[in-house]
From Swiss-Prot:
PANTHER family: 50S RIBOSOMAL PROTEIN L36 2, LARGE RIBOSOMAL SUBUNIT PROTEIN BL36B
Keywords: Ribonucleoprotein, Ribosomal protein
Gene Ontology MF, one: structural constituent of ribosome
Keyword Ribosomal protein: yes
SUPFAM superfamilies noted in UniProt: Ribosomal protein L36
Keyword DNA-binding recorded: no
The gene coding this protein: rpmJ
One GO location term (cellular component): ribonucleoprotein complex
Protein name as annotated: Large ribosomal subunit protein bL36
NCBIfam families: PRK00831.1 (NF002021), rpmJ_bact (TIGR01022)
Coiled coil: none
Lineage, uppermost ranks: Bacteria, Pseudomonadati, Bacteroidota, Bacteroidia, Bacteroidales
Amino acid sequence: MKVRASVKKRTPECKIVRRKGRLYVINKKNPKYKQRQG
C-alpha cells in the first residue's frame, strides 16, 4: 500500500473507493497498484 498525496488510476482495472473519508485505489488483478490518499 502506497500512501500518496494524489491517487490516480494506473490501469483500467483500478477502482477508486472511498472508505472512512479516505480515498483508496484497489486492483484485484495486480495488487501492486494499491494506494491510499494521505
